[in-house]
A protein has these predicted regions:
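Short S/T/G/P-rich N-terminal loop/turn motif that feeds into the first structured element of a domain
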Residues: 1-138, 142-169
Length: 169
């Protein structure tokens, strides 16, 4: 559906002139823009209550970018599968979604996204998770990072009150 304008229903409701006016003002607020696609992986994500990107009440996000070279993609994928299995075995309360870099990204990476109420809640659940996984988890993370070419993390928040999703017809 890359050829479809997902904002078309909004433009139709607002009118082209009003819609353009919003973006004319918005365009003065930043100087760089890029588009890319990441693909959510059900196979690699750990969300025992069902895979969803809408984690109500948990709008804080921690994004872990695991950059990988082509020769290590499969090895890293296998370690992420092992990590998911360990989370399942231990009944971890910290859930994560895994995305894979796709169209428009520079470099290849797996992206692990963890939701929490706020930064303090993230630290608390991460500490509890580390304690739960113990030495087995520590070793698995060390093994996994042998295949990571570069690591970056970012944190931020979601704004559901500012979100727009076109209705499906």
């Amino acid at each position: 559906d890359l050829d479809k304008n997902t904002l078309a229903p909004l433009v139709e409701k607002m009118g082209n002139e009003n819609f353009r006016a919003i973006f004319d003002r918005f365009n003065k607020c930043y100087d760089k823009h890029g588009d890319y696609i990441v693909v959510l992986s059900n196979e690699l994500s750990y969300m025992p209550n069902g895979l969803t990107i809408n984690t109500e009440g948990k709008n804080y996000r921690k994004w872990h970018f695991l950059y990988v070279t082509p020769e290590n993609v499969q090895n890293l994928r296998e370690k992420i599968k092992e990590l998911k299995a360990l989370y399942e075995k231990k009944g971890a309360k910290e859930h994560f979604r895994i995305y894979r870099a796709g169209f428009g990204t520079m470099g290849d990476y797996f992206l692990a996204v963890v939701s929490a109420k706020d930064a303090q809640d993230y630290v608390r659940q991460s500490d509890e998770n580390d304690a739960l996984l113990g030495e087995e988890g520590k070793k698995l993370f060390e093994d996994m990072f042998k295949y990571v070419d570069k690591y970056e993390s970012k944190s931020g928040g979601m704004r559901p009150d500012l979100s727009y999703s076109a209705s499906k017809k």
